[in-house]
Each structure stands twice: as structure tokens, then as C-alpha cells.
UniProtKB/Swiss-Prot annotation:
This is Small ribosomal subunit protein uS7m. Gene3D superfamilies: Ribosomal protein S7 domain. Signal peptide: none annotated. Belongs to the universal ribosomal protein uS7 family. It comes from Homo sapiens (Human). Its main location: mitochondrion. Coiled coil: none annotated. Keywords: Acetylation, Disease variant, Mitochondrion, Primary mitochondrial disease, Ribonucleoprotein, Ribosomal protein, Transit peptide. Residues 1-37 form a transit peptide. The lineage of its organism: Eukaryota, Metazoa, Chordata, Craniata, Vertebrata. The modification N6-acetyllysine is found at K208, K228. It is found in: Mitochondrion. It comes from the Eukaryota. The gene is MRPS7.
Length: 242
């Protein structure tokens, strides 16, 4: 086990001091597992308003931070990030999960068509309703999308824990990222079901989103089924701490 480490150390010691410093500063050669950048690199700030703000309006602290960034190491901005007003990290995550075979152009097009279909359906419902009912109809597709996913998020999940040679499904509270992931996964899985093969993806997804927005549909039922299973296994909840 020690031989490879000694070999690497000798290889590093054979390099000149200037070469070693240059290699250590290269992000692609930094010895950090699964990371392109070393811990010294800071996350990029993708905000046009921050850079458009004149220097005269900055506070002393903001001036110091801006001057400090001139000498700091900054990570490259991700290719999918943008400073557009339409940028939504949740929709971007949903688009990436919906993507198949790396065809992000198609996934993004389907997402745009889905939001357009949601808006068309809500406006049709709005114009067909009475004056009193129009005030209760939500027409913003972004608000409907976020609320639909929020309604699909489970609060408690099941985790297999080995105890006495057997695996038990133990109920545990889920973190926010896991809740959001399950809601998106269930929504996409239901839309890819083979029951309605002739229905296009934007039409199916918009229908599922509107159902989830009103706390209805198979995705909401799937969340309730998971909660019922967690309630049935609540006697095993103490296995979390063992």
C-alpha cells in the first residue's frame, strides 16, 4: 500500500519548485476527489444587477468584496446558468430529469410547450367562468408548476435498515432535496406511462400538473400511499437510532 504513495512523492520531489507551484494552481490537476476545482475556488456570482451597480453607490464592505474578487480564484459558470429573468432553478432541474440521451434542446422545448398548454387551459377556464369564479382561477403557469410539485412532495419516506439479518422499512423524515426529487420523479414517471401512448408529452404533463395543483391525480395518490406505509411501520421508527 505504501509503495504507490512513495512513488508519487518521489515524482513530485523531482519537479522544479516553479513547476510544482504551477501544477498546484491548475484546477484540472488538483488532487480533490470528484472535483475539478480546489477548495480555494469561489462560486461565481451570476447577477447582472450586481455588476451594473456603479462604484459610487457601493458601501465600504461591498467595495472591499469587489476588490477582493479581483485576486480570488473563481469557478467557471455552468453552461446551463443564465441571468435571464425567466431563469428558474426548479424548472431547470425538472428539464434535466426529463431529458433522455442528452437531448436537452428537446427537453427544454417540451417544458416550454407544457407551460404554454397549462396557460391555455387556465385561460379557457377563466373566460368560461363567471365573474366571481374568475378571481379564484390561477393563470400563471410558473405558480401552478411550483405549487403542483409542492403538493406532490412527501414528508416521510421509508429507508431499508438491516437489523438482525433482516431489512426493515423504517420511516424517516425526508430532506427538502429528496422531497423535491421524488415529486419530480413521480410526475415524469406517470407521464411516461404507456396507458396513453397517443397523447403527446406536453399534453400529459400539463394535465398531471393541473391535477396535482388541485391535490388530485395519481401522483398525489402515490404520495398518500407512501405516507400510509410509513404510518403502518411507525413501530419501527426507533431503528433509526440503532
Amino acid at each position: 500500500m505504501a509503495a504507490p504513495a512513495v512513488k508519487v512523492a518521489r515524482g513530485w520531489s523531482g519537479l522544479a519548485l516553479g513547476v510544482r507551484r504551477a501544477v498546484l494552481q491548475l484546477p484540472g490537476l488538483t488532487q480533490v476527489r470528484w472535483s475539478r476545482y480546489s477548495p480555494e475556488f469561489k462560486d461565481p456570482l451570476i447577477d447582472k444587477e450586481y455588476y451594473r451597480k456603479p462604484v459610487e453607490e457601493l458601501t465600504e464592505e461591498e467595495k472591499y468584496v469587489r476588490e477582493l474578487k479581483k485576486t480570488q480564484l473563481i469557478k467557471a459558470a455552468p453552461a446551463g446558468k443564465t441571468s435571464s429573468v425567466f431563469e428558474d432553478p426548479v424548472i431547470s432541474k425538472f428539464t434535466n430529469m426529463m431529458m433522455i440521451g442528452g437531448n436537452k434542446v428537446l427537453a427544454r422545448s417540451l417544458m416550454i410547450q407544457t407551460l404554454e398548454a397549462v396557460k391555455r387551459k387556465q385561460f379557457e377556464k377563466y373566460h368560461a367562468a363567471s365573474a366571481e369564479e374568475q378571481a379564484t382561477i390561477e393563470r400563471n403557469p410558473y405558480t401552478i408548476f411550483h405549487q403542483a410539485l409542492k403538493n406532490c412532495e412527501p414528508m416521510i419516506g421509508l429507508v431499508p435498515i438491516l437489523k438482525g439479518g433482516r431489512f426493515y422499512q423504517v420511516p424517516v423524515p425526508l430532506p427538502d432535496r429528496r422531497r423535491r426529487f421524488l415529486a419530480m420523479k413521480w410526475m415524469i414517471t406517470e407521464c411516461r406511462d404507456k396507458k396513453h401512448q397517443r397523447t403527446l408529452m406536453p399534453e400529459k404533463l400539463s394535465h398531471k400538473l393541473l391535477e396535482a395543483f388541485h391535490n388530485q391525480g395519481p401522483v398525489i395518490k402515490r404520495k398518500h400511499d407512501l405516507h400510509k406505509m410509513a404510518e403502518a411501520n411507525r413501530a419501527l421508527a426507533h431503528y433509526r437510532w440503532w
